[in-house]
Regions:
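Charged, amphipathic alpha-helical segments and their flanking helix caps
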Residues: 1-23, 43-127
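Short acidic low-complexity segments
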Residues: 25-34
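A short, polar/charged loop/turn motif at coil->beta-strand junctions and beta-hairpin connectors
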Residues: 33-36, 54-56
Length: 127
């Protein structure tokens, strides 16, 4: 079975070293039970109509959840990811053309003091 697009983006980011220092999760955030651990969550976020033999856009949401009181580290990771995608929009043939949607969004804080950035990407893919 072909991996889902959020799994392909996770693999692409992992291969490029963008997930280093993060516990990688899929679909939903699961508290690692350790405030010193940063987490990156990959999940699907909709897209355009999927038609046979035509390209479609698949949207992927990547939550970058920083360790407690490590806000600058989380922001640096977010900027590295955005820079990587801008410089390498066709680095992975399984992803197709990837681009960031909405740049870097305003962060939110969790009750525990973790900073969260929700990055969204559009992947144009077709066979």
């Amino acid at each position: 079975m072909t991996p889902l697009m959020h799994e392909r983006v996770r693999n692409m980011f992992g291969d490029a070293g963008q997930t280093t220092g993060f516990a990688v999760q899929q679909l939903m955030y699961d508290d690692p039970g350790d405030l010193s651990k940063a987490v990156m969550v990959f999940r699907p976020s909709g897209g355009t109509a999927i038609r046979t033999d035509l390209g479609s856009e698949y949207y992927v949401l990547v939550d970058v959840v920083g360790a407690k009181d490590k806000r600058k580290d989380a922001l640096s990771a977010v900027q590295r990811i955005v820079d990587y995608v801008q410089a390498n929009p066709m680095a992975d043939e399984c992803v197709g053309y990837i681009q960031n949607m909405g740049a870097i969004p305003a962060p939110v804080l969790t009750e525990e003091g973790r900073i969260v950035f929700r990055l969204q990407f559009a992947c144009t893919y077709g066979e």
